[in-house]
Amino acid sequence: MNRTALDQYEELVTDALKSCSAKLRKSFKTAFIQLMILYMVLPRKINFTQMGRYSDSSEQRFRQLFEREFDWIQFNLFLMRQRFGESVRKAIAIDASYISKSGKKTPYIGKFWSGCASQVKRGLEILGIGIIDIDSRDCMMLRAEQTPDKAYLEKQGEDYNLVDWYLDV
């Protein structure tokens, strides 16, 4: 039996969804699998309009899918175990990345450090948390979290700063 790469990918995503502890509806699983395949095959930027255009589902279905709670860490841990096996030598990687963004209504837009530009720039920052398999010298992302702006941190308390937020994540 000759299986394509997309068939193998669909099977892997299905197995990962089965490993999630929460009971998921069949409609959610179907839409989620379709979403993961779209991420692999969309030729341009990925947004809800493009997803609706390149699939047999509507744009609204994908919007609703993103409004639902989902345990990404458990899903990604399953994929990590599939990829790395049960090797013992692992480490946690944390990386904050600057994303250029303009606009006045974007949540948490602020001034963040850009390592490429070696300066503070206005935009967004995303904190990536991954697991490194030391033996295979490979890393897999577990979670990404948008870094809050200065105003949010000030609301949390006088002594609360960005390092405290990183530790809370």
How should these model regions be labeled?
Residues 1-169:
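Conserved, well-structured functional cores that handle cations and Mg-NTP chemistry
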